[in-house]
Each structure stands twice: as C-alpha cells, then as structure tokens.
Amino acid sequence: MGVISYDMEIKSSLSAAKLFKAFVLDVGTLINKALPNVIKSVEILQGDGGAGTIKLVHFGEGGPVPSVKHHVEELDKDNMSYKYSIVDGEALMPGLQSISYVIKIEPSGHGSVCKHNTTFHFKAGSNINEDEIKAGKERAAEMIKAVEAYVQANPDY
C-alpha cells in the first residue's frame, strides 16, 4: 500500500474560534451558503457531530463528485482540532483505499491559521494520480477561503 500525505497552512483574518466554529462546527449549515454551486447539503446519517458521526456530503454540479461519506474520528473543541476520513463515495477513485484529514486551527498574528493535513492511502499496485491530488489540495484551500469570505460578509450568520 502506498501513502501520500501533504500539509498546508491557510491564513485567515478570522479569529481561531470563529474560523473553527464556521469551518468545523457549523459546516453543515454554512458550507452550502458559502459555496452554493459546489456543495448542495451536508446530512448527518448517524451521531451528533462528534466522534463516530457519519455525514453524507452532496455536491452540486460544480462539485468534484456527486457525494461522499465522512466518518468523524475526533472532534476536540478545546484544542480546535478535527479529524475525519472519507469512507465511501466517488472520491475514493479506483486504487484508493481511504483519505484521512486532520484540521487544526490556531491563533495567529491578526487572525488564525488553519493547518490542514491530508493523507491518501493507495491499494498495492495502484497508480498515483498527482494531478487529482493537487486538485483536491486546491479545493480544500478554496473551501476554507469561501467560508472565511462568507463569515466576513455575514458576521451574524
């Protein structure tokens, strides 16, 4: 099995608490407002939003795939960290066993920084498509920036 992992840091003018609330805690109701052409809805299939929760994300016509299922592995509100994996859906292209994400939001200078780690686990003998991985990285950064812009435009969302 092959593994590719990448880290990225995205700076935000929002406070760490506000970005964590918007991008992690309220993402189910906020993301489709911030990216209406990309994400149609986020539905909780099981759980209360914390560890063990299963979410079904429905993408719109501008989305990368029709839908994916997320399994929440960890939600730490005190440390503003969130860990989840894609467990089902078209994002798990042939040869890809799983995708895991770790998000940690920290205070920084005049706002915050979102530290985002993504790990792709490939089945043995499968080819790695670097272009698709790069596109996924760009989409993640765009989502964070879209949530930031929405909250700035709608501070009382």
From Swiss-Prot:
Keywords: Glycoprotein, Pathogenesis-related protein, Plant defense
GO cellular component, one term: cytoplasm
Molecular functions per Gene Ontology: abscisic acid binding; protein phosphatase inhibitor activity; signaling receptor activity
Entries under Gene3D superfamilies matching the protein: 3.30.530.20
Keyword match Mitochondrion: no
Residues forming coiled coils: none
SUPFAM superfamilies: Bet v1-like
Glycosylation sites: 79, 117
GO terms (BP aspect): abscisic acid-activated signaling pathway; defense response
Bilayer-crossing regions: none
Signals that turn on the gene: By cytokinin treatment.
Family: Belongs to the BetVI family.
Note: Related to intracellular pathogenesis-related (IPR) plant proteins and to other allergen families but has no allergenic properties.
Name of the featured protein: Probable intracellular pathogenesis-related protein T1
Lineage: Eukaryota, Viridiplantae, Streptophyta, Embryophyta, Tracheophyta
